[in-house]
Amino acid sequence: MTVPESPPTSPSTSTPAPARATGSDVGRAAFVTASEIACVAGSLLGAGVFGGPPVAQSAGGALSAEATLLAPAGPAFAIWSVIYLGLAVYTVLQWLPGRLASPLHRRIGWWVGASMLLNAGWLLVVRAGWLPVSVAVILALALVLGVIVRRRAEAGPVPRADAIVVDGTVGLYVGWVSVATCANVTAWLVAAGVRPGPALAQAAAVLVLVVALAIGLVLLRVSHGNPAIALAMIWGIAWIAVGRLTGAPASAVTGVAAAVVATALVVAAVVAFARRPRHRLGGPVIG
């Protein structure tokens, strides 16, 4: 009878030795790095650094802070700086010793890279004025980020640094994109000539905000109460409230509804965070 071989162990422990990086792992990390470079270039293009108008002034201003009832006020977009910084840190983190073969990065790395390419692609199509295409791209981006959230939640234990970087960055990313998707779709419809009367427009805006709340609740559940998701959504929706209550287009109904939804997300986030297993944020943590 043949005795099964035991898995290799580390010299000082009886636990299996860490997996070794493969060519696929290196290729994945290189893909993420290339995607990060494309994402940075896209963000600079979107800001008008290479010439031409910034995103807010592209496509006839359809995505400006004053374009629709669901457009967040200008300061809301500062969150992109934090998200881009987090993506840069993730890109470096995945190359550190022991990370290339990490089960977590094997599960999410390709998806993170894809999200950065979609981000850059969205900026390009908006600059080109292709609003219908921008809707398709941002929906694909939201879907990819949702997959990352789920795969992170299903991952095994990960080092605390990885948990902080991944949960923080992806949480802010998916939370903000969820709000931005609502604004993007609304901007496309308005630009396409869908202009209902004031009462119907406000009712539709309130309905979309309720949908955003539902999305936030689902994401909180799937992510085991990742507070970064709620924080980004609260940030975006609160700035919608500010925009409607203090700027144009003015809408007290939409502004108050946005404030209520943001408050509801605060409560939901606190409850979800309090109920999460002590060892989890967006998934198990070790170290």
Per-region residue spans from a language model:
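Short aromatic-rich membrane-water interface segments that cap or initiate transmembrane helices
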Residues: 63-79, 164-173, 194-204
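Membrane-interface helix caps and helix-loop-helix hairpins in membrane proteins
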Residues: 121-135, 192-199, 218-223, 245-250
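Alpha-helical transmembrane segments of multi-pass membrane proteins
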Residues: 36-55
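Membrane-interface transmembrane-helix boundary segments in multi-pass integral membrane proteins
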Residues: 71-74, 196-214, 241-266
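Membrane-interface capping segments at transmembrane-helix boundaries
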Residues: 96, 150-156, 269-285
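Alpha-helical transmembrane segments of multi-pass integral membrane proteins
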Residues: 35-39, 111-122, 139-148, 166-184, ...
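Central hydrophobic cores of alpha-helical transmembrane segments
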Residues: 228-238
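N-terminal membrane topogenic signal
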Residues: 20-34, 80
